[in-house]
Regions:
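Conserved donor NDP-sugar-binding/catalytic core segment of glycosyltransferases
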Residues: 49-88
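Acidic donor-binding loop at a coil-to-helix junction in glycosyltransferase catalytic cores
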Residues: 134-141
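Catalytic donor-sugar/metal-binding loop of nucleotide-sugar-dependent glycosyltransferases
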Residues: 134, 146-161
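A recurrent flexible, glycine/aromatic-enriched loop bordering the glycosyltransferase active site
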Residues: 99-119
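Acidic donor-binding/catalytic loop of UDP-sugar-dependent glycosyltransferases
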Residues: 32-36, 41-58
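Active-site donor/metal-binding and catalytic loop motifs
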Residues: 155-174
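Active-site-proximal specificity loops/subdomain of glycosyltransferases
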Residues: 1-35
Length: 182
């Protein structure tokens, strides 16, 4: 359990939360001298049963610094309004179109940068100075620092299912995009 109190409100947000957790994971890996894998995940996301084994199998013996993990937002159900499901379809289509356009143009660093679906080796995390404390976009900036190391990859053998929920806590990102579209 990690207990963090007296946090400066200027820095509290998803970036700060990820940083606290990832820094603690790094500390624990350093304590046992192990270059472990640090996974990022959102509390309201779900995953396939093979999530951990798929990540471990891809990153364990390879020289990969990190990976973007395949994701699909839910598009049907009773947990959210139909408009939220409709808007997440549009938003995710935009994300996939953007990444595919980068690939089509030959951009060598065309990866999804979704915070709930990324993993990084502890050594790469330390080498790049850890996670930033941004209130939004922390995943984008962090993943691009890891990609710059080279040997970044995708894991398409499992799926993260992030929530399509709205959010007014961040200036941009999935939750804000869904909220603004309603």
């Amino acid at each position: 359990c990690i207990y963090a109190n007296d946090l400066n409100p200027k820095f509290t947000g998803v970036g700060c939360a990820r940083k606290i957790g990832m820094d603690e994971a790094l500390r624990r890996f350093l304590h046992v001298n192990y270059d472990g894998i640090i996974c990022c995940f959102d509390a309201d996301s779900i995953v396939q049963k093979n999530y951990l084994t798929a990540i471990y199998n891809k990153l364990k013996s390879n020289s990969y610094a990190g990976a973007s993990i395949y994701f699909e937002h839910p598009i049907l159900g009773n947990s959210f309004k139909s408009a939220e499901y409709e808007n997440i379809i549009l938003y995710e289509t935009h994300l996939r179109y953007y990444k595919n356009a980068l690939e089509f143009c030959g951009f060598p660093f065309a990866f999804h940068t979704v915070g709930s679906s990324m993993a990084v080796k502890a050594s790469a995390y330390a080498k790049q100075g850890g996670m930033n404390r941004r209130k939004a976009g922390e995943d984008f900036y962090f993943i691009n620092k890891i990609i710059a190391l080279g040997n970044y990859t995708e894991i398409n053998t499992t799926t993260v299912i992030p929530s399509p929920r709205t959010s007014d806590r961040v200036p941009f990102g999935t939750g804000r995009a869904i909220l603004d579209a309603l």
